[in-house]
Design a protein with these regions (language model features):
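Short, low-complexity N-terminal intrinsically disordered segments enriched in polar/charged residues
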Residues: 2-51, 68, 157-158
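Short beta-strand edge/turn micro-motifs at domain boundaries
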Residues: 125-157
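Well-ordered beta-strand positions in beta-sheet-rich domains
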Residues: 97, 113, 130-134
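A solvent-exposed, acidic/Ser-Thr-rich amphipathic alpha-helical stretch
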Residues: 18, 42-106, 127-128
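Polar/charged side chains located within well-ordered beta-strands of beta-rich proteins
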Residues: 29, 90-92, 110, 114, ...
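A short, structured loop/turn motif at beta-sheet edges
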Residues: 98-108, 124, 137-143
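Generic short beta-strand segments
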Residues: 51-54, 111-119, 152-153
Length: 158
């Protein structure tokens, strides 16, 4: 084992606690979801997810088992959004439901609820759904990246 590898294995990431951790995760997830729903920047998304990202969805099943596959799926959706009459979505965190716990030496577990809005083309936006989520975040030298996503309890909003 090389010295550099041994040193890397011994290093642990410093995870803040309390309100500081919640603020960091809230900012990271806001950035992630803005990229995913409002943006169209696969290179940026690739920096927001881990290479071994896994996502599970109560309606779609296993969405991805790698960051690369997730980014490729996103890139395909980006192309579809370019049509003038394409459906566009927006996700909004319900801040009162947000709960963040530290995972020492690794990152944080985030859980909460969010709502989704849709619009066709430039048409009016409509609230269409609500769901719960759990996300495992990994902190590294380049910041926070999401490593695991559980998206469940999806319900239509009348």
């Amino acid at each position: 084992m090389t010295f550099a590898l041994a040193l890397a294995l011994l290093q642990t990431v410093a995870i803040p606690g309390g309100d500081a951790l919640t603020a960091e995760i809230k900012a990271a997830e806001a950035d992630l979801f803005a990229t995913f729903f409002q943006g169209c920047d696969p290179a940026r998304l690739a920096k927001q997810v881990t290479p071994d990202l896994e996502m599970y969805h109560d309606r779609e099943g296993v969405v991805t088992t790698s960051g690369e596959a997730f980014v490729a799926l996103y890139a395909k959706q980006c192309e579809a959004k370019k049509a003038p009459d394409a459906w566009r979505s927006r996700r909004e965190l319900l801040p009162e439901t947000l709960h963040v716990d530290p995972v020492p030496g690794f990152g944080a577990i985030e859980e909460g609820e969010h709502v989704f809005y849709e619009r066709k083309g430039d048409g009016p936006e409509k609230l269409v759904g609500r769901a719960r989520f759990v996300q495992l975040w990994k902190k590294g030298p380049d910041g926070w990246r999401v490593a695991r996503i559980l998206s469940f309890d999806h319900k239509a909003v009348p």
